[in-house]
Regions:
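Surface-exposed, low-hydrophobicity interaction/linker segments
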Residues: 33, 41-83
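C-terminal motif of bacterial Sec signal peptides marking the signal peptidase cleavage site
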Residues: 15-18
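Bacterial N-terminal signal peptides that target proteins for export
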Residues: 1-7
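Hydrophobic alpha-helical targeting segments used for export or membrane insertion
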Residues: 9-13
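Short, compact, well-ordered microdomains
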Residues: 83-119
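Bacterial signal peptide processing site
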Residues: 20-22
Length: 119
């Protein structure tokens, strides 16, 4: 009888832990020359990474997405040497959001002709 209670408790705790919708996830976007969803929200007199991240944050917040943090790094293997708007610059934007906002974020990339999307 004691072992049944123990296993029941373990199962209940396991279910409670696995169903946590407040978990955070990180989504990525390969920055383009001028085809990023938030480009209209970036108004910079002087360019800084913090100001650029703030523009991204402002855009996502206006779309109803809670942002935990934003970071970016250069991945030289993703650089596309062309001048078109859809060409990737090599900068990968990482956006940490609550798991429940993942679907909203993926919808923002929409159906674009270049196949750009959050991953």
């Amino acid at each position: 009888m004691r072992s049944i209670r123990f296993f029941s408790l373990i199962i209940i705790l396991g279910i409670m832990v696995s169903c946590n919708k407040d978990q955070a996830i990180s989504m990525h976007w390969d920055e383009t020359g001028c085809f990023n969803p938030w480009d209209n929200f970036i108004t910079l007199d002087t360019f800084t990474t913090e100001a650029y991240h703030q523009g991204i944050n402002d855009y996502l917040t206006s779309e109803g997405i809670t942002v935990n943090y934003i970071s970016s790094e250069l991945d030289s293997s993703k650089i596309e040497y062309c001048f078109a708007c859809h060409c990737k610059t090599g900068k990968v934007i990482t956006i940490n959001i609550p798991k429940e906002d993942k679907r909203k974020l993926k919808r923002l990339s929409g159906n674009n002709q270049f196949g750009l999307a959050f991953y």
